[in-house]
Regions:
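Beta1-alpha1 glycine-rich phosphate/pyrophosphate-binding loop at the start
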Residues: 1-3, 37, 41, 45-85, ...
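Rossmann-like flavin
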Residues: 100-207, 218-220
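Glycine- and aromatic-enriched mobile tails/lids
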Residues: 121-122, 126, 481-483, 499-508, ...
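Extreme N-terminal leader/targeting segments of oxidoreductases
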Residues: 1-25, 43-51, 69, 551-592
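N-terminal glycine-rich phosphate/pyrophosphate-binding loop and immediately adjacent elements
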Residues: 13, 19-149
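C-terminal segments that line or cap access tunnels to active or ligand-binding sites in enzymes
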Residues: 206-221, 280, 284-286, 291-516, ...
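Helical element adjacent to the flavin cofactor pocket in flavoenzyme catalytic cores
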Residues: 203-286, 291-292, 304-305, 311-313, ...
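Alpha-helix N-cap/helix-initiation motif
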Residues: 30, 79, 83, 222, ...
Length: 592
């Protein structure tokens, strides 16, 4: 497997890998990474669909990319997906996945046209004082000292960031700024999370720094992630006769690691219909393992019941499976680095379905748009800056479900601090019913207090979801804590998803999951075509200059607080570049 960039490799079709007709594949899980692996096995690996087996313990595919209406409960979206125009693997695959809505076009075509015709941007990024614009006004509000802290992290070698926290690099100069408000709520970072991952994020999205305050950097699908992404992939795979096995729980994968240069997956232990079974493997049987799981132990409440906070990792789950696998070889990772403390990895979301028009005026007052036009509504999350829960909420294009009533609006609410008492509901979010979470949200969008309970009861249905391990991948880590996608010496197995290691890309993104799927297939089948490298904006001087200026709210480098000697040094450098292309470039991007 090798990386590439440019159209030559992107538009090429690889030859059929040698010996693929004699191989089979078993994929543990059916999340985005797993489905991506299956798609690449079929498309570029040219493996017969009948030879590809997807083992899913639940009744539905998709993993964390869900969206479903539960009978007697309501609509549930545990999370949402923010896309980028440089998710190189994602678009490489979705150009080949047919739309399930429009005949003759791909998922990429559909998505591209939608976001061209209806570009995303926010008209209100944050509120205070019960629905009033917080007037962040597109500013990062970073001091020179704070900017230098970010720059220091940016240039610190990865080797020096092992097991380091964000607070090891940032103090209040950054943590009290609009920059951190935007960043933590958009990506769900906490102060104690990995400094390494923070650095990777800054480098990965350096080309989008200027688009963070108003979300012009983002793109969204038409419907929820399940209907817009997962279903088309499943239909594509089913059309190629890929075998989906639901209700099949993988308890363990057994390996022979006696030869470090020839590690072999020998058996998959499964539980099917309550009975233990074993799938014996040869070197021609490839195994793709989704290890860990950010939505494991997630629980749903209801309008009148809180979601249970269940932190016990039981036998048979994704974390238990990874622990059993990790015990067999040091290169298979250290799961307990990520799942040892759910108090540091949990947050909650809730899906609010409006049942009439009574709440809508308060939404319009904040987002300045009508939710029922089919176009962008909030344009990304609206953060309640003075919320003790650190609540944010968003409304994507409506309807979010094909079956959704035309006059109902779905609102996604999430909070990072589930253990803090609310501002209107005086108890932690994790103890609240759906109705109570809705009441807290209504309070913060400016509904008069004497109407809050009535509207939460009769004008909305709210389903809360607790996810104890949703931020597990953000915990401070070191090299080796996550297994490589294909560990050294592997003959017939690979790891997939957010807890597999691939260089430069960032976790908690659709692209990361899909990249692990592509890399796994290309490596094990020796597919002779380049895997598109992570977009290289961090190596583009134009993006670096633009981000430097935008991060400082348009201030020129010459306006920094400098001593006399520093000013003289800058003046001397500027004299040296006068009349050159360097001066021209620096002026073009507002650096000088």
């Amino acid at each position: 497997m090798y990386y590439s960039s440019g159209n030559y490799e992107a538009f090429a079709r690889p030859k059929k890998p040698e010996g693929v007709d004699n191989k089979s594949a078993y994929i543990v899980g059916s999340g985005l990474a797993a489905l991506t692996a299956a798609c690449y096995l079929v498309r570029d690996g040219q493996m017969k669909g009948e030879h590809v087996h997807v083992l899913e313990k639940g009744d539905l595919p998709g993993g964390a990319c869900d969206g479903y209406k539960f009978e007697n409960l309501g609509y549930v979206m545990r999370g949402g997906r923010e896309m980028d125009n440089h998710f190189e693997v994602m678009w490489d695959l979705f150009r080949s996945i047919p739309s399930i809505e429009t005949e003759g076009v791909s998922v990429l075509d559909e998505y591209y046209w939608l976001n061209k015709e209806d570009p995303n941007y926010s008209l209100c990024r944050a509120t205070v004082n019960r629905g009033q614009d917080a007037h962040t006004d597109g500013k990062f509000d970073i001091s020179d000292k704070g900017a230098m802290e970010i720059m220091k992290l940016f240039f610190t070698p990865n080797e020096q960031l092992q097991d380091k926290k964000i607070t090891d690099f940032f103090d209040d100069e950054v943590l009290n700024s609009n920059f951190w408000l935007y960043w933590r709520t958009m990506f769900a970072f906490e102060n104690w999370h990995s400094a390494l991952e923070m650095k990777l994020y800054i480098q990965r999205y350096i080309h989008h720094i200027g688009g963070l305050p108003d979300f012009t950097a983002l793109r969204f699908t038409k419907y929820n992630q399940y209907e817009s992404m997962i279903l088309p992939m499943v239909k594509y795979l089913e059309s190629h006769n890929v075998q989906f096995h639901y209700g099949v729980q993988v308890a363990n994968v057994e390996f022979d690691c006696s030869d470090p240069k020839h590690k072999l997956a020998k058996r998959i232990d499964v539980i099917r219909d309550g009975k233990k079974e074993a799938i014996d493997l040869t070197e021609n049987d490839l195994v793709f393992i989704t290890n860990g799981g950010c939505v494991e132990n997630s629980s749903m409440g209801s309008q009148n019941e809180p979601a249970a906070y269940n932190t016990e990792l039981k036998e048979g789950g994704g974390w238990d499976m990874w622990r059993k696998i990790a015990a067999q070889d040091p290169s298979f990772g250290h799961p307990d680095k990520f799942c040892h403390d759910p108090e540091q990895t949990n947050w909650m979301s809730a899906t609010v379905e409006t049942l009439d028009q009574k709440i809508i005026p308060y939404i319009k007052n904040i987002c300045k748009r009508d939710p029922f036009t089919g176009h962008v509504v909030t344009g990304g999350i609206v953060t309640v800056k003075d919320s003790s829960w650190l609540m944010s909420w968003t409304i994507n294009r409506q309807p979010q479900f094909r079956t959704q009533p035309k006059d109902h609006c779905l609102v996604w609410v999430y909070s990072l601090f589930t253990d803090k008492p609310g501002d209107y509901i005086k108890k932690p979010m994790r103890e609240c019913t759906g109705k109570e979470i809705c009441m807290e949200w209504l309070y913060h969008i400016g509904v008069p207090e004497d109407q809050i309970e009535e509207l939460a009861t009769n004008s909305a249905n709210t389903v809360p979801v607790m996810m104890p391990y949703i931020d597990a991948f953000f915990m401070p880590r070191a090299y080796g804590d996550r297994p490589n996608v294909v560990p050294e010496g592997s003959v017939n197995f690979a790891f997939l998803g957010q807890f597999a290691e691939t260089p430069r890309d960032t976790i908690f993104t659709t692209e990361y999951s899909m990249r692990t799927g592509m890399e796994a297939v290309y490596t094990l089948l020796n597919v002779d075509r380049g895997v598109p490298e992570v977009w290289g904006s961090v190596y583009d001087v134009r993006d670096l200059l633009n981000a430097t200026v935008k991060l400082r709210d348009g201030k020129k480098a010459t306006d920094m607080d400098m001593g006399f000697m520093e000013k003289m040094a800058v003046k001397k450098v500027l004299g040296k570049i006068e009349g050159t292309d360097i001066e021209k470039l620096l002026k073009e991007y507002g650096v000088i």
